Amino acid sequence: MKPKRTILCADGNEQALSIRKILLETRGYRAICCTRAEQALEHLRDHQIDLVIADLMLPDLDGSRLIEAVKIASPQTPAILLSTRLNIFEYETHADVFLPKNAQSSAELLGHVRALLVRRRGPRKTLVAPSVPRTAASPNFAVARA
């Protein structure tokens, strides 16, 4: 059985956090939930985190600043920033993906989670058969015509 990917979720809204936790865990991910950025940074130091999902409006720190701290500590960790504010682009953010909090569907969020985790892992390795020299006896032999 492959190990579960760990996703760190930070949101000041406990109800939104519990919904997100259920959504992620029913899809086979391990979700660590925090209501404060300080807690999230402690978990980042203590655990291997594969992805971060943060709300822009956290009680103790701006979510984009949390993601900036994540990227400084672990540059390869992908991050999704959620916000009810649509003018997020006025912020300089280090997030890989921005999703409007009220408009996002579960399928959209999960699609971004999967895509970012695949991008972090890299493409699946495919086995390549060793090259066999082509000869006149092989069925793939081609003759160049002049």
Q: Which residues are covered by each model-predicted region?
A:
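Non-catalytic signal-transmission and effector/linker regions of two-component phosphorelay proteins
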Residues: 1-12, 107-146
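Two-component/phosphorelay signaling modules centered on CheY-like receiver
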Residues: 14-32
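Acidic, metal-coordinating helix/loop segments flanking the phosphotransfer/catalytic sites
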Residues: 33-51
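Acidic catalytic/metal-coordinating carboxylates
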Residues: 36, 62-65
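Short amphipathic alpha-helix used as the core "switch/output" element in two-component signaling
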Residues: 42, 64-76
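Active-site residues of response regulator receiver
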Residues: 55
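The feature encodes the CheY-like receiver
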Residues: 59
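Alpha4 helix (beta4-alpha4-beta5 surface) of REC/receiver domains from two-component response regulators
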Residues: 65, 81-111
